């Protein structure tokens, strides 16, 4: 139990996909202007990551490995992720039109988010069990959400601040991201697995 706690904590704070592995930067920079947008893209991405990790674990161990089709892994993963995103979009459109309107613009973008493909692949390459794969996906998604919300709240304050002309736009965004990354590097000595 203790090792699972450290495993989850490590994936959220120390091995954060945005700040350490530099995955998922497109929605991080593009959809973090407001906290509402950050929560929307984070929720949708987290849901797709967890569901696709579960599906892809089963596909890998019950179809690709037994039939020696490992060379098709990335193509199959991309197809399943695309199918999952479309399925979620159809379900949301029919069951919750309000949630669909909030997340509607973000759902197609999730398919191209590299973190959605990377999390199941890293889980596979790290030889995680089924439970560890689920915990890895949930904790990585929570880390993604945490950083998105922190950054979007800081970014909202930056928009209200008087930023020098040379730093307006992308420069201040990149400086802020680098400072947040340095803060998260401080957690490096917190957990040793």
From Swiss-Prot:
Query: Where do the TM regions start and end?
Result: 5-25, 47-67, 72-92, 102-122, 134-154, 171-191
Name the Enzyme Commission number(s) assigned to this protein. 7.-.-.-
Instruction: Give the record's GO biological process terms.
Output: electron transport chain
Q: Per its database record, what is this protein's job?
A: Part of a membrane-bound complex that couples electron transfer with translocation of ions across the membrane.
* Source organism of this protein record: Buchnera aphidicola subsp. Schizaphis graminum (strain Sg)
Signal sequence coordinates: none
Q: Species lineage, top-down?
A: Bacteria, Pseudomonadati, Pseudomonadota, Gammaproteobacteria, Enterobacterales
Primary site of residence:
membrane
**Topological relation to the membrane, as annotated:** Multi-pass membrane protein
Q: How does it assemble?
A: The complex is composed of six subunits: RnfA, RnfB, RnfC, RnfD, RnfE and RnfG.
Name the coiled-coil region(s): none
Any keyword Membrane? yes
Q: Where in the cell is it found?
A: Cell inner membrane
What the entry lists under NCBIfam families is as follows: PRK05151.1, rnfA
- Spell out the family assignment given in the record's similarity comment: Belongs to the NqrDE/RnfAE family.
The protein's name is Ion-translocating oxidoreductase complex subunit A
Q: Which GO terms describe its cellular component?
A: plasma membrane
Keywords attached to this Swiss-Prot or TrEMBL record, sorted alphabetically, are:
Cell inner membrane, Cell membrane, Electron transport, Membrane, Translocase, Transmembrane, Transmembrane helix, Transport
